[in-house]
Amino acid sequence: MTETQNTSRRPGALIAMSGGVDSSVAAWLMQRDGFDCTGITMRLTRNEAVDTEGLHTCCSERDIEDAAEVAYAMDIPYEVLDFTADFQEKIIDKFIRVYEAGGTPNPCIDCNKYMKFDHLLRWAEAHGLDYVVTGHYARVEQDEATGRWLLKKGLDEGKDQSYVLYNLTQEQLAHVRLPLGGLHKSEVRAIAEEQGFVNARKHDSQDICFVPDGDYARFMEDFTGKHYPAGDFLDVSGKKVGTHSGAVRYTIGQRKGLGLAMGAPVYVCAKDMQANTVTVGPEAELFDTIVYANEVNWIAIPELTGPLRVTARTRYHQVEQPATVYPAGPDGFRLEFDQPQRAPTPGQAVVLYQGDTVLGGGTIVRVAKLSLIHI
């Protein structure tokens, strides 16, 4: 995407409209600031279950109707783009692969990477639009000294979404605008109320859009036609202590729903997908100090050349924890926390910060206790 050459025209902005209040207010703010806005909603699934009463997700038919109504009220062009085939290939199929390999995927991060900030940026460029705008609570700024684009936390700490945006590249950040980054959610709802938007009081989406009821194992069986067989629960010594209903149904750190009576609380500590076993143990077994990551994207720096002090999150909305990050291969890093962390899980993202700036992040591939690492 090239920068605007004709300074006499107003810059164009593609607004990624989910049908929720955040993207609607983002559209209004951009229009207020003089941008020619075009509203776009991505159709990602054909699953009509997302319209089930009481389930708050995104991309349903009701959401499309809400987005269209807001666009009409703002008098801006609006289209629905069908990305269902690519969404299945890049998001749903990967989601299933990661679970079947024993990990815990984060499809919302993949959707941002492959759909919102890839497909929509290319569509915007093809249609002469300068920016893609979303309703994420994060900030994009340019470092005057280095010229690098930076991703920073949203000012509303409770709504900050920088964690799910760590994959943004320099080229993408140059053409992304996040107008809600400096606002609090209460301010956003107040604007929507003032403008009379139909979704001003709409609940935030809370679930994976293609698994609105949260039963991901049932979704996987329905989608693939597979049946995930029962297997053995093992204790940390390898002794069988029960029977589980399929290893994919359990996540690291899980306590509820195990159906085990062992005299003390136990948690899922490990899974062996080839053997179809799930290891359970005391909560102390969940704590690890070392995290290895790959598929790394650096934002604030071009590359990691030596150890750096950082704070880090291994899950969404976690309080950041102090750590030191070290280079590890051409596309990876090793992160050593100052204190052991509860249940860092392969497949999840680990995102690194310096202050309110995202340094970069990657996908967790392995974890270990400090005593098992020889540096």
Name what the model sees in each region.
Residues 1-166, 177, 187, 193:
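ATP-dependent adenylation/nucleotidyltransferase module used to activate substrates
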Residues 373-375:
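Conserved small/polar residues in nucleotide/adenosyl-binding loops
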